[in-house]
């Protein structure tokens, strides 16, 4: 795998986590679908089966810096210690470490009982280097993952994809491992992609005349490893009238953890495998001059949306 991708490349790419900006946090199969339906009772929250691995003795990268980042020289993907909703009283220490874009994690300490998302350590790939990455041009967009997060009662958060469209103006999240939180926003419907059942919710933002979400696709049953057909998610949103494949563009795909609380004690979070397979749309180059601006924009977007996100927390 080459570190740099030619700007003109529009082809099939299978990648082990990438990113578009060096050393900075950024703004952040085959489907069978069901017509939007009435609200279903949430499924029971399952526990992650394996305890997360802690940091190795000598990782290639480690930092406790606010929004510190590292680019994997083999893949060009960026890993970020994204602490977008810090500093505030509930924020504690968070250390990010990495050996590769497919082997990294954080040790996070967030206040007991806090219910607002404070941090989102994640790995990212950006799209549309020289031209907009139209959703209609994508013929495949699939990701695989293996992650582990704490399951203790005081842990509040989830492992999730955070996908940005339309130059950071539209947000789609896919929750795969949810610990001790649930939604009470209106349910848009349910869907099955690749044998996985999702409940689908939406906050009511609007950008450029279109709903900007965030949209939330929440697995009915937690998975700590699996395959996610991201393109099928976009296709469901288009059929429901929320996206247009002819107009909407893909900006970035992130994967990591939204962390609200670790019960005030250090907890390990670990990703041991991740791939993103892309066909038909253009990846961004490794480095872009607008990284810092987009990091700030992402923080502003999250500050506007996340602290007011309507959750009821369970599992105390």
Predicted regions and their residues:
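Secretory targeting signatures
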Residues: 1-24
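Sequence contexts marking disulfide-bonded cysteines in secreted/extracellular proteins
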Residues: 20-22, 85-92, 261, 290-292
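Short, low-complexity, disordered segments immediately C-terminal to signal peptides
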Residues: 24-43
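Solvent-exposed N-terminal domain segments of exported/luminal and surface proteins
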Residues: 54-107
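Extracellular-facing segments of soluble proteins and assemblies that are Gly/Ser/Thr-biased and enriched
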Residues: 111-192
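Short helix-loop boundary/capping segments
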Residues: 162-232
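Long, compositionally biased interface segments
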Residues: 223-315
């Amino acid at each position: 795998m080459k570190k740099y991708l030619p700007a003109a490349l529009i082809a099939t790419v299978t990648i082990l986590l990438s990113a578009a900006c060096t050393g900075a946090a950024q703004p952040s199969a085959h489907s069978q679908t069901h017509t939007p339906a009435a609200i279903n009772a949430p499924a029971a929250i399952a526990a992650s089966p394996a305890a997360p691995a802690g940091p190795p003795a000598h990782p290639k990268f480690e930092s406790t810096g606010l929004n510190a980042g590292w680019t994997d020289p083999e893949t060009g993907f960026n890993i970020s210690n994204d602490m977008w909703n810090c500093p505030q009283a509930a924020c504690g220490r968070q250390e990010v470490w990495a050996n590769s874009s497919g082997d990294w994690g954080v040790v996070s300490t967030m206040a007991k009982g806090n219910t607002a998302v404070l941090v989102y350590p994640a790995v990212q790939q950006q799209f549309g280097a020289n031209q907009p990455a139209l959703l209609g041009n994508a013929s495949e967009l699939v990701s695989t993952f293996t992650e582990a997060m704490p399951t203790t009662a005081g842990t509040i958060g989830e492992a999730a994809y955070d996908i940005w469209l339309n130059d950071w103006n539209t947000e789609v999240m896919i929750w795969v491992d949810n610990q001790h939180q649930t939604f009470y926003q209106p349910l848009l419907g349910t869907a099955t992609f690749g044998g996985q059942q999702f409940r689908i919710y939406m906050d009511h933002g609007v950008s450029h005349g279109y709903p900007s979400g965030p949209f939330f696709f929440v697995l009915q049953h937690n998975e700590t490893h699996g395959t996610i057909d991201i393109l099928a998610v976009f296709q469901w949103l288009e059929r429901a009238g929320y996206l247009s494949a002819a107009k909407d563009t893909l900006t970035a795909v992130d994967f990591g953890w939204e962390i609200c609380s670790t019960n005030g004690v250090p907890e390990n979070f670990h990703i041991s495998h991740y791939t993103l397979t892309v066909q038909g749309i253009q990846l961004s180059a490794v480095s872009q001059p607008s990284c810092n601006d987009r990091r700030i924009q992402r923080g502003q977007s999250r500050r506007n949306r996340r602290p007011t996100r309507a959750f009821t927390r369970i599992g105390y």
